[in-house]
Amino acid sequence: MGEIRVDNFSLEDFFSGDIDSYNYSSDPPFTLSDAAPCPSANLDINRYAVVVIYVLVTLLSLVGNSLVMLVILYNRSTCSVTDVYLLNLAIADLFFALTLPVWAASKVNGWIFGSFLCKVFSFLQEITFYSSVLLLACISMDRYLAIVHATSTLIQKRHLVKFVCITMWFLSLVLSLPIFILRTTVKANPSTVVCYENIGNNTSKWRVVLRILPQTYGFLLPLLIMLFCYGFTLRTLFKAHMGQKHRAMRVIFAVVLVFLLCWLPYNIVLFTDTLMRTKLIKETCERQNEINKALEATEILGFLHSCLNPIIYAFIGQKFRHGLLKIMANYGLVSKEFLAKEGRPSFVGSSSANTSTTL
């Protein structure tokens, strides 16, 4: 991941329209020497619509992920392994979403926050994106070990899980360093500044690197891990006789399905764009504009994932609902009778009490 579109300046007069395709896909602009004039469609209406969507996603993520963090921290004495992952995931998604208003403002006014904040916000969004996806893969492995192998040794040692989370954050930081190093500001015209990678004369080479990095570690590898782990987990649940089996399967299906719906379309379009920009398929103005529009639309789906995770991992699950109702009952927002009527959550999984598969 890496770039945010800024479409509010004269594209024909600078970079021959390539800045218009400036998006969150780590797609550095062409240099003047390799750019070809290509008029870009007017996206004013789309730009303002995207700004509204960014703000809504931020608000939904703020509410949803804050509630997840509140419930987990309030019940930290009974915190499970899955809860540790969920807490880190909520933090990552929350900070990812909090960067969106900045990029929304840049769509209207260009980048107005200076070179240092260009690096900081880009770096923060990059780290939180990587950590979010890597933590999703860790959760799938946790469920796989807990259900398929009924593993309790690693699960019971919470400090090891915390070490795994710290490792994921560190790995995310390392993967994000190219963005921090290369991202800077540039004047697109006398009145507009943009925030993007400055890669000099090695544009084509670095473009491939900055595309392969997020697509491999930010999508393909986590997806393969999730498909493998959840595939075997589902097979085990089908064979088992568990009272909450169908509920657990719904959550697992939702995890994979929503991840695919959010990120698969974007990555398909991004891969096509990479093939075009590396001259493996013919580049035309019509094709470039079509891909730019597709990147804009599918990018929004990817951003939506940051506010959908609380729904998938928490709101569907019994454990979260009971934890939230417990907090509300303690503050008199719901009656104790209602809390008792709802009952305590039950979980599916191994004999270990330190993991749940229904969240």
From Swiss-Prot:
Cysteine disulfide links: C118-C195
Give the GO terms filed under biological process for this record. Answer: acute inflammatory response to antigenic stimulus; calcium-mediated signaling; cell surface receptor signaling pathway; cellular defense response; chemotaxis; immune response; interleukin-8-mediated signaling pathway; metanephric tubule morphogenesis
Task: Report the principal subcellular site.
Answer: membrane
Q: Name one GO cellular component term.
A: external side of plasma membrane
Residue ranges annotated as Cytoplasmic topological domain: 75-83, 142-162, 231-250, 315-359
Segments spanning the bilayer are: 48-74, 84-104, 120-141, 163-182, 208-230, 251-272, 297-314
Q: Which domain of life is it from?
A: Eukaryota
Q: What membrane topology was assigned to this protein in its record?
A: Multi-pass membrane protein
User: What keywords were assigned to this record?
Assistant: Cell membrane, Chemotaxis, Disulfide bond, G-protein coupled receptor, Glycoprotein, Membrane, Phosphoprotein, Receptor, Transducer, Transmembrane, Transmembrane helix
Keyword Glycoprotein annotated: yes
Q: Which GO terms describe its molecular function?
A: C-C chemokine binding; C-C chemokine receptor activity; C-X-C chemokine receptor activity; chemokine receptor activity; G protein-coupled receptor activity; interleukin-8 binding; interleukin-8 receptor activity
Gene3D superfamilies reported in the protein's UniProt record: Rhodopsin 7-helix transmembrane proteins (1.20.1070.10)
Q: Transmembrane: is it a keyword of this entry? A: yes
Task: Name where it's found.
Answer: Cell membrane
Instruction: Tell me how the protein is altered or processed after translation.
Output: Phosphorylated upon ligand binding; which is required for desensitization.
Q: Which residues are glycosylated?
A: N8, N23, N201, N202
Q: Which residues lie on this side of the membrane: Extracellular?
A: 1-47, 105-119, 183-207, 273-296
Described function: Receptor for interleukin-8 which is a powerful neutrophil chemotactic factor. Binding of IL-8 to the receptor causes activation of neutrophils. This response is mediated via a G-protein that activates a phosphatidylinositol-calcium second messenger system. Binds to IL-8 with high affinity. Also binds with high affinity to CXCL3, GRO/MGSA and NAP-2.
Spell out the family assignment given in the record's similarity comment.
Answer: Belongs to the G-protein coupled receptor 1 family.
Subunit composition and interactions:
Interacts with IL8. Interacts with GNAI2.
Q: What PANTHER family does the database record attribute to this sequence?
A: C-X-C CHEMOKINE RECEPTOR TYPE 2 (PTHR10489:SF689), CELL ADHESION MOLECULE (PTHR10489)
Output this protein's name.
C-X-C chemokine receptor type 2
Per the UniProt record, the source organism is Rattus norvegicus (Rat)
Organism lineage = Eukaryota, Metazoa, Chordata, Craniata, Vertebrata
Q: Which gene encodes it?
A: Cxcr2
